[in-house]
Design a protein with these regions (language model features):
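Beta-strand residues that line the small-molecule/cofactor-binding core
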Residues: 62-64, 71
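Short beta-alpha junctions and helix-cap segments that line functional grooves
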Residues: 2-3, 52-53, 65-67
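Short conserved beta-strand and strand-loop elements enriched in small hydrophobics
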Residues: 14-19, 49-62
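N-terminal helix initiation/capping motif
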Residues: 1-33, 43, 88-98
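Conserved hydrophobic positions within beta-strands
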Residues: 30, 67-69
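Short, solvent-exposed secondary-structure boundary/capping segments
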Residues: 39-42, 75-83
């Protein structure tokens, strides 16, 4: 099967808070991240297409990342980032080049 990802991913272990639009925030753990999105390990079920805001601390900087759920399965969800600002882009870029 051919890899569809555009951006390289790095393995991480970052505590996150994920808040679905119109729903309650829940805790999860980001297990991999790229410039395009992240996989969040969680027991919560969030439907495909749900807009979310991910609160995470990267390199000592608190970030709120907008995104959309692109897939969900028992144990986690894949989130594609929305429009990121310069600060968010820089922080993720720094994480990817460690």
């Amino acid at each position: 099967m051919q890899e569809k990802r555009v951006h390289p991913r790095v393995q991480v272990d970052l505590a996150v808070s994920c808040e679905p639009k119109g729903g309650a925030a829940f805790a999860g753990v980001a297990k991999d991240v790229s410039m395009g999105g992240m996989f969040i390990e969680s027991t919560e079920v969030v439907p495909f297409g749900t807009q979310v805001t991910i609160a995470v601390r990267i390199s000592g900087v608190d970030l709120k990342l907008p995104g959309t759920v692109r897939w969900a399965k028992p144990g986690g969800l894949g989130v594609q980032f929305g429009l990121l600002g310069a600060r968010e882009t820089h922080s993720i870029s720094q994480l990817l080049t460690r």
